UniProtKB/Swiss-Prot annotation:
Key words of the record: 4Fe-4S, Iron, Iron-sulfur, Metal-binding, Methyltransferase, S-adenosyl-L-methionine, Transferase
UniProt protein name: Uncharacterized RNA methyltransferase aq_257
Residues the entry annotates as binding [4Fe-4S] cluster: C70, C76, C79, C153
Residues in TRAM domain copies: 1-57
Binding site for S-adenosyl-L-methionine: Q260, D308, D354
Enzyme Commission (EC) number: 2.1.1.-
One Pfam family here: tRNA_U5-meth_tr
Length: 425
């Protein structure tokens, strides 16, 4: 079967950006397919329960199919659904989200309120990680860890793309450069970089690169090494933070802290979370980062605590509370589990959770059900783990009251959503 081309009718798009089909009763996941198409595909992986394939020829095309604007699409692994027009991307993401909640979450009536589209289909990302391999600057292929050399990335902010020729110049003097991470502020026009290298880079050399090779809006570079899957900072030259502005709020964001990637939706995202949360007396913001939600939420309640396991993020969050003149918010360097455990027995009206793609840990779900806050605002970036968590939380006494999809990641399979859960009457 692996050498023989398959003829497949694609039923729908599924999480991961694959077209879903069946052949002789077996599930087939087809890369670069569109819903309702007839395609010819080549098998790339054969498993007992399913097959993975890639489109080689479109026999009957979907009206939603388009020529991908990016010349690297089909090689580069950064985008999965660029061959679909944006309307179809949103429709498919909505279908995947709702189907996940019904099938996995066992939620029969989903109070879905619609999608918030990105204000830009392209050039929306203000954080980018360039991979470097044999003088190629770009991103890994979708099928192997081989870097596709690019002149620009259509998802990256235009300013970030301006850095690519400068990175090529840096490669002439730092031969073992493996990655360059860019963190850019479109509201202040400033950026910090992480250089990930095998060996320690000379500090004077890095200072010279900052002053003479990179554009003046790059305000700092951190030198990092890899230890396992983690990055360890050796030292920095220049500043190690930039500032972002979202409406009236200011945020300091250090090189090791996280900030929302799609700058075109910052204000919308914040507005929706504030709207879902409403007023409260005491709140917790778990996975709080630099206080993106926590600090504005402090205006709507008497007191709120933010927790995050990242020490850099907590330092930024504490600084951000000061520059925004908020004195009813405190931050703690702790995992969500540890922070919740310390709050057992306390009356909590609101908990905001924004977990990684793996969703909430079992221990975190257990503590939420034990503490029973009046409201949980759940920000999800994975509909399958989100549905799993909702199934457990709704069985434990919560009801899903509101749900919206916010498309922070156009051209990719990633699905972000905001949900409100309240204790059942």
């Amino acid at each position: 079967m692996k050498d023989k081309p398959l003829k497949l009718t694609v039923e729908k798009l599924v999480y991961g950006g694959y077209g879903f089909s069946r052949l002789n009763g077996k599930a087939v996941f087809v890369r670069f397919a569109s819903p309702k198409e007839l395609v010819e595909a080549k098998v790339v992986k054969e498993k007992k329960d399913y097959t993975e394939a890639v489109v080689t020829k479109v026999l009957i095309s979907s009206p939603a199919r388009r020529k991908a604007p990016c010349p690297y699409y089909g090689e580069c692994g950064g985008c999965q659904i660029q061959h679909l027009n944006y309307e179809e991307q949103l429709r498919s993401k909505k279908d995947i989200l709702l189907e996940s909640l019904e099938r996995i979450g066992k939620i029969k009536e989903v109070p879905y309120e619609g999608e918030i589209p990105s204000k830009k289909e392209f050039n929306y990302r203000v954080r980018v990680q360039f991979k470097i391999q044999e003088n190629r600057v770009g991103f890994y292929r979708w099928d192997v860890k081989e870097v596709v050399d690019v002149e620009e990335c259509l998802l990256a902010h235009e300013r970030i793309n301006e850095l690519i020729p400068h990175i090529r110049e840096v490669l002439k003097v730092i031969k073992d450069l493996q990655e360059v991470h860019v963190n850019y502020s479109p509201t202040r026009d400033e950026a910090t970089l992480k250089f990930v290298t095998i060996t320690h880079t000379d500090e004077k050399l890095l200072q010279n690169i900052l002053e003479n090779v990179l554009p003046e809006w790059v305000v700092g570079i951190g030198d990092y090494g890899k230890v396992g899957n983690s990055l360890v900072k050796r030292y920095k030259v220049g500043r190690e933070h930039i500032f972002m502005d979202v409406g009236k709020w200011q945020y300091r964001v250090s090189n090791d802290s996280f900030f929302q990637v799609n700058y075109t939706l910052w204000e919308d995202f914040l507005k929706e979370v504030l709207d879902f949360s409403e007023s409260y007396k005491k709140g917790l913001d778990l996975h709080c980062g630099v206080g993106f939600f926590t600090i504005p939420l402090s205006e709507q309640g008497n007191f709120i605590e933010g927790a995050d396991a990242n020490p850099s993020a907590i330092k930024d969050a504490e600084y951000n509370a000061k520059i925004n003149n908020r004195d009813n918010v405190i931050f703690e360097e702790a995992t969500a589990f540890k922070h919740l455990k310390r709050r057992i027995g306390e009356v909590i009206n609101l908990v905001v959770v924004d977990p990684p793609r793996s969703g909430l840990l079992r221990e975190e779900r257990d503590l939420l059900l034990k503490n029973k806050p009046d409201k949980i605002v759940y920000i999800s970036c994975n509909p399958t783990t989100f549905a799993r968590d909702l199934k457990i939380l709704t069985k434990g006494g919560y009801e899903l009251k509101r749900l919206k999809l916010i498309d922070n990641f156009p051209q990719t399979y990633h699905i972000e959503s905001i949900a409100l859960l309240e204790v059942k009457d």
